[in-house]
Every structure is written in C-alpha cells, then in structure tokens.
C-alpha cells in the first residue's frame, strides 16, 4: 500500500486531466511554440490559429507530456484564449490560469507558468514570422519566456541538440530563436 499523500487537485483539474479539451496537434495552425521543464519532465506545445485581419485567436490546441496539472493548465489555456485578440491573450497570467482551474498546489504552479510561457512564445514567434513588432509587445522577455529558455539551455547541456516535440512551427524548443 502506498504511503504517498495525493496532491489536493481541484475537481476542475481532475476533470480536464481525464477529459482534456482541444488536445492534439493542429495541422492548420498559424503558429506554435513549446515550453518544457527538465526538472519535472513536463512539456507543453501550444498551437494557435489566428485570424490575421482581426488579430484574433480563433482556435487553439495543445500537446502535453506531463502530469495532471500540466494537462489541465494547457487545456484551460486553449479555452481561455479562444476569441481573444492577440494582445488580450498576451496579457493572460499564470495566476489567471491557476485560478481558472480552481487553484493549483504550490508545487504545481510551474505547470500554469509553462502553459503561459508557451503561449507567449507562440505570440512572439507569430510577430517574428510576420516581421512585425506591435508597440504593446515588450522588448524584454517575460518571466515565463525566460524560464522556458533557461530550461531549454539545461536540456541542451544535458542531452545536446534536442527538440522536445521534434518540430515546432516558428518557435519553441529546438529552434535557434532566443524567445
């Protein structure tokens, strides 16, 4: 019999873990990006389909290799961003994702940080791909983006040239970009 104490996940986390929404790669994605953590092994790739005229996210999906909190955070993020402008999506915080899930145990905050990090990397990659930089997009990388880069560097040191998912579209692990 196990002596492990289960983490106090909310009913929403457990529901989205068992029945994730928008799971799977998106073949017609405008852009995608990945964020991962070698500390726990979690990886999230976010795919966005963008209405370029309206600058609005019309569809989002994800791939997740990780724990219940990782899958739930990516799933809820894809629901939250749909219908938002790119700028509105950029302003989403890891805390908002955690709150949408009914809270996460402190030891699992990094899961919502990874989801938001992948989102922000996808947004940056989108504008880099277009050769544009809107005035609201900060020059400096966010904490979530910096964490993703730190973790990718650690992966590279541990494993050499390494791509988490084997092929992101314009951003994420394994790319030569720094954001």
Predicted regions and their residues:
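Active-site- and interface-proximal helix/loop "cap" or "latch" segments in soluble metabolic
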Residues: 39, 49-113
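Structured beta-strand/loop patches that form or line metal/cofactor-binding pockets in enzymes
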Residues: 23-57
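C-terminal binding/interaction regions
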Residues: 2-28, 32-33, 84-88, 92-179
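Broad hydrophobic/π-residue packing in well-ordered secondary structure
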Residues: 8-10, 17, 45, 61-62, ...
